[in-house]
């Protein structure tokens, strides 16, 4: 029944809205839930496209929350504020380019070789351990404590870490946050920059998946479009809450809890993968 597929879209939207921004891997959660909750009447090609395109709902939440800061044409902005906005966009572009270029050519290869329970589990655990290590080591005061002072070189270094997010289970936000922490960027600054960095990456990835879907001879029916819109709408609403939560959270807390969660989830996925293998 179509009503069940709408309900499934809502579940996917909730998961996307939460896991896209928290550094806990949206892929790790989607690959698990797909074994239990699936659309009965949709093709694998549609699901591959669906899982990426619903991210547009999440990224629209960033645009809405930070619209004034991201809009260089906002009335009333001083020349200095306009300049800062353009500089911010320039840093976002610099950081986005490495993953965009590599992803364009190797995304299918990464997905074919690493989109499985074991690979995702390993990346969840590895980055979980990285978060815990980074937070427990001796800390120097962050060199970058506001976004305006983020050097272009550091933005590029964060972008290079984002390439690692091509490995399913890494987490795009997780990779960029680790990159920022290693390069002396404060938690709040790297978290906010991660939000902005998602704008070109997610729009580009979604456009690419839609193009591939259509080029391979697939069509989108009204029902499929509706399911996409439902999931995107839910992801948008949930993201509005999660982004505000994470922004406040990192001002007072570190990322240790997310590291522990990743290790726990990775362990659960490894056990689940072993059980599946034993059961044939």
UniProtKB/Swiss-Prot annotation:
GO MF term set: undecaprenyl-diphosphatase activity
Entry's localization field: Cell membrane
Listed name of the protein: Undecaprenyl-diphosphatase
Keyword match Cell wall biogenesis/degradation: yes
Keyword Mitochondrion belongs to the record: no
GO biological process, one term: peptidoglycan biosynthetic process
Enzyme Commission (EC) number: 3.6.1.27
Membrane-topology annotation of the record: Multi-pass membrane protein
Family matches, as InterPro entries: UppP
Keywords linked to the UniProt accession: Antibiotic resistance, Cell membrane, Cell shape, Cell wall biogenesis/degradation, Hydrolase, Membrane, Peptidoglycan synthesis, Transmembrane, Transmembrane helix
Coarse class of the protein's main subcellular location: membrane
Catalytic activity: di-trans,octa-cis-undecaprenyl diphosphate + H2O = di-trans,octa-cis-undecaprenyl phosphate + phosphate + H(+)
Lineage: Bacteria, Bacillati, Bacillota, Bacilli, Lactobacillales
Pfam families associated with the record: BacA
Protein family: Belongs to the UppP family.
Membrane-spanning parts: 2-22, 45-65, 86-106, 114-134, 147-167, 188-208, 223-243, 255-275
Functional summary from the UniProt entry: Catalyzes the dephosphorylation of undecaprenyl diphosphate (UPP). Confers resistance to bacitracin.
């Amino acid at each position: 029944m179509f009503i069940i597929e709408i309900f499934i879209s809502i579940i996917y939207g909730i998961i996307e809205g939460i896991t896209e921004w928290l550094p806990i891997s949206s892929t790790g959660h989607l690959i698990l839930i797909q074994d239990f909750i699936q659309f009965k009447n949709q093709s694998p090609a549609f699901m591959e496209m669906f899982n990426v395109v619903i991210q547009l709902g999440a990224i629209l939440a960033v645009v809405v929350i930070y619209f004034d800061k991201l809009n260089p044409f906002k009335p009333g902005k001083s020349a200095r504020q306009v300049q800062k906005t353009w500089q911010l966009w320039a840093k976002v572009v610099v950081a986005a380019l490495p993953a965009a270029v590599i992803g364009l050519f190797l995304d299918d290869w990464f997905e074919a070789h690493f989109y499985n329970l074991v690979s995702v589990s390993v990346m969840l655990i590895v980055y979980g351990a990285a978060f815990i290590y980074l937070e427990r080591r001796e800390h120097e005061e962050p060199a970058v404590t506001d976004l305006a002072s983020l050097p272009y070189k550091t933005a590029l270094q964060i972008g290079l870490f984002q390439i690692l997010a091509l490995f399913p289970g890494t987490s795009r936000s997780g990779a960029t946050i680790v990159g920022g922490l290693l390069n002396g960027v404060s938690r709040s600054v790297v978290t906010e920059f991660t939000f902005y960095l998602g704008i070109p990456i997610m729009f580009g990835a979604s456009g690419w998946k839609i193009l591939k879907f259509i080029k391979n001879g697939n069509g989108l029916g009204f029902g499929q479009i509706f399911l996409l819109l439902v999931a995107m709408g839910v992801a948008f609403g949930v993201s509005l809450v999660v982004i505000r939560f994470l922004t406040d959270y990192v001002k007072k807390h570190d990322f240790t809890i997310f590291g522990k969660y990743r290790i726990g989830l990775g362990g659960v996925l490894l056990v689940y993968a072993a059980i599946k293998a034993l059961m044939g």
